[in-house]
């Protein structure tokens, strides 16, 4: 996310072209990001994730993370690969479950109430203060030769250290507060999977595939069916329907855990601003129940997650 304040002429021309010609008379759209040095933008990232785990007949263990992060961005350089962007956190709401109750940290604080100095409040405050101090850099590399574009983020490396020496929360409470998680969220603001570097006609569909490693239990393969659903007033709506399957290792060890999907429902909707060359919004929803088995032990995990990325004027 670093370098060059020099504008490469050929690259700039290509980027300007991709914005001005992003939509043509045949209702084709190029889902490519467009950047100019000095551009500013604001995005709000919102995560609401609930996990319910139950082992056998034992009482269920519930976790919930509810976060809202508001970031101001300024494009500081454009080069032949993409853009270098400075980001500043201007708003932060961190919520997490401890026991059966939600606790929260808010900045700037909109209420005058002083929260009790309970352990979860203290930890959330440490997380929040470390996040506010983060010097965030973003590098956006556009699609080249058919390779998908990517986003790389730095600045959140120290947030996890605030969880050391405590036994209230596990790492799940970090939610979005990690370089990789912020990068994944912003990828949805600047790219549409499987559409980078292509002119796509309204009504067209395509498919993307991804794999998540599950260790000795195998892998989760996710196939997403996409469709360019509509184009109205310069905003293209793209919808995705992910479907997951679990692939067991070819030679699975009987002593290793196994997993199966019991239920799933997922959806993605992107509102792409053709003139700006980035998403006005992206909402991803996933509800999934996974059953893990190891010998006589069975663990059921229900996960319900909504991640939204919204551009603000």
Indicate residue ranges for each PLM-predicted region.
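Signature of exported/secreted
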Residues: 23-313
């Amino acid at each position: 996310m670093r370098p060059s304040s020099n504008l490469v002429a050929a690259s700039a021309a290509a980027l300007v072209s991709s914005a001005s010609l992003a939509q043509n008379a045949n209702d084709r759209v190029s889902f490519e990001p467009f950047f100019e040095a000095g551009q500013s933008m604001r995005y709000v990232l919102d995560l609401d994730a609930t996990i319910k785990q139950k082992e056998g007949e034992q009482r269920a263990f519930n976790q919930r993370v509810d976060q809202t992060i508001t970031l101001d961005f300024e494009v500081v350089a454009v080069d032949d690969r993409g853009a270098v962007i400075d980001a500043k956190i201007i708003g932060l709401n961190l919520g997490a479950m401890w026991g059966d109750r939600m606790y929260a940290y808010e900045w700037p604080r909109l209420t005058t109430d002083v929260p009790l100095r309970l352990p979860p409040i203290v930890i959330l405050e440490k997380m929040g203060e470390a996040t506010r101090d983060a010097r965030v850099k973003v590098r956006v590399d556009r699609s080249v030769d058919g390779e998908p574009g990517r986003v790389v983020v730095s600045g959140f490396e120290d947030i996890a250290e605030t969880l050391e020496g405590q036994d209230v929360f596990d790492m799940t409470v970090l939610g979005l507060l990690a370089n990789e998680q912020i990068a994944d969220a912003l990828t949805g603001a600047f790219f549409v999977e499987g559409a980078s570097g292509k002119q796509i006609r309204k009504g067209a569909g395509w498919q993307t595939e991804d794999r998540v490693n599950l260790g000795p239990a195998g892998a989760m393969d996710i196939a997403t069916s996409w469709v360019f659903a509509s184009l109205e007033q310069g905003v293209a709506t793209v919808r995705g329907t992910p479907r997951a399957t679990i692939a067991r290792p070819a030679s699975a060890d009987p002593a290793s855990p196994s997993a199966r999907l019991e239920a799933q429902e997922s959806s993605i909707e992107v509102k792409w601003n053709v003139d700006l060359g980035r998403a006005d919004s992206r909402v991803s929803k996933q509800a999934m129940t996974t059953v893990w088995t190891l010998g006589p032990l069975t663990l059921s995990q229900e996960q319900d997650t909504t991640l939204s990325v919204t551009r603000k004027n």
